[in-house]
Amino acid sequence: MCGRFLRISSLTEVVSAFEATGDSELRLSFNVPPTTTVYAIRHDETRRLVEPMSWGLVPFWAKDTKRASNAINARVETLTEKPSFRHLVKNHRAVMPLDGYFEWDTVTATGSQPKQPYLVRPSIGGEQSFDGMFAAAALWSTWHDPEQEGVALQTVAMVTTQSVGRL
């Protein structure tokens, strides 16, 4: 499961790579945590849009945003079963552009259990280096605040699955 990722590509690079439109430049980050505003690319009637969304899906039916950080990932194996995601699969698909993501491993050499982050990036043709962005599948939703008329929040969850083999 992805809990942090790397975003060092600019809006211009994202727009160009995905042949999309967008006008909200976000701050670059080497450590994007849950609930941060991230880029999500979705399709409207005629074009691809790069939109800022909060990372942590809040279902449209939620009373508040308190559990957003619990829904940063959507497991592909259970997408059609979970109430938060099943209604989004058909019409609320997106991609999240990334430059890498972090996985943590427990280090036991010292006898303690600190977590060590490892940056994961794709390799191209067996090469160990990769300099560029890639995309993760995602689902998005718009949540309307029941307490404040006209206040809406666009949120997104990354679709994840089990890794194949060792990372």
Across the structure, where does each feature detected by a protein language model lie?
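Short linear sequence motif anchored by a di-proline
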Residues: M1-L167
